């Protein structure tokens, strides 16, 4: 006879017994249930008080089981809710240490089922949570995207304006910042030709000089050509103190233009 059978016969529910006068009397049904597996038992550390009335009152509760050795009441919980002891677990869900292949497979499967259950519970009736680059949660995603697009357009426009201003000269920047500005004319052009008093200013007109669009005095004689057509200042003494790069640059440009013209002519001849 197994231990479970013995405990069931000794402490389990009994059949109704006949009394001496022939009438059946009610059998006392025990509230004690015998279980084979200890995994479904969770101890509540109820110390025995020694009072029979307290034990009977606790025994009337549903889902409570009595430990025959310690006389403690335990609560029944399904195996999925039973907390495992504090054991070291690996990332796969298996416990560390020497175990059988069946135990390892069961532990890994249990972790996978828990992950699937949590994912399914999180996906039900849940709204999508949007976050920005810093990790902060976005309350209104549509408004956030609209503001972000507007900020991107403003940033792009700023970069375009900045690059355009970098490629401008002083005159273009001055015109951009002062829309009503007009370039200054030469002093000779400012003199009215139909002015009867112009004949008295012949000597002064001979000494006139040109002005730049910004109103600066320019050199009024011949000066060497440069790539940017920048005239020297009006105080220049006419001595070229450069390293000759401008002359070499113009010579190279002329050589390239002549070579290109020769190639075009040779292609047309064939």
UniProtKB/Swiss-Prot annotation:
Highest taxon, organism lineage: Eukaryota
Keyword Cytoplasm: yes
InterPro entries in alphabetical order: Bud13 (IPR018609), CWC26_splicing_factor (IPR051112)
Keywords from the UniProt entry: Cytoplasm, mRNA processing, mRNA splicing, Nucleus, Spliceosome
Major location category of this protein: cytoplasm
Subcellular location: Cytoplasm; Nucleus
Region Disordered, annotated ranges: 1-31, 81-113
GO biological process: maintenance of RNA location; mRNA splicing, via spliceosome
Signal peptide boundaries: none
Cellular component aspect of the GO annotation: cytoplasm; Prp19 complex; RES complex; spliceosomal complex
Function, as annotated: Involved in pre-mRNA splicing.
Similarity comment: Belongs to the CWC26 family.
The protein's assembly and partners: Associated with the spliceosome.
Listed name of the protein: Pre-mRNA-splicing factor CWC26
């Amino acid at each position: 006879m197994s231990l479970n059978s013995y405990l069931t016969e000794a402490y389990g529910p009994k059949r109704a017994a006949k009394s001496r006068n022939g009438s059946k009397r009610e059998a006392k049904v025990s509230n004690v249930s015998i279980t084979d597996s200890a995994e479904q038992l969770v101890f509540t550390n109820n110390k025995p008080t020694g009072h029979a009335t307290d034990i009977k009152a606790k025994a009337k509760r549903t889902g409570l089981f009595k430990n025959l050795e310690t006389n403690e009441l335990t609560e029944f919980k399904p195996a999925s809710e039973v907390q495992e002891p504090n054991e070291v677990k690996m990332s796969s869900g298996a416990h560390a240490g020497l175990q059988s292949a069946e135990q390892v497979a069961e532990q890994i499967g249990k972790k996978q089922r828990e992950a699937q259950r949590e994912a399914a519970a999180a996906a039900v009736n849940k709204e999508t949570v949007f976050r920005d680059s810093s990790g902060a949660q976005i309350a209104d995603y549509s408004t956030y995207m609209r503001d972000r697009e507007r900020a991107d357009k403003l940033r792009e426009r700023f970069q375009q304006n900045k690059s355009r201003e970098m490629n401008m000269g002083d005159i273009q920047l001055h015109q951009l910042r002062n829309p009503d500005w007009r370039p200054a004319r030469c002093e000779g052009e400012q003199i009215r030709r139909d002015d009867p008093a112009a004949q008295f200013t012949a000597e002064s007109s001979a000494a006139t000089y040109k002005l730049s669009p910004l109103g600066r005095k320019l050199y009024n004689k011949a000066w060497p050509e440069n790539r940017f057509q920048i005239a020297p200042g009006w105080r220049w003494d006419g001595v070229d103190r450069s390293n000759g790069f401008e002359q070499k640059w113009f010579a190279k440009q002329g050589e390239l233009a002549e070579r290109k013209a020769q190639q075009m002519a040779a292609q047309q001849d064939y």
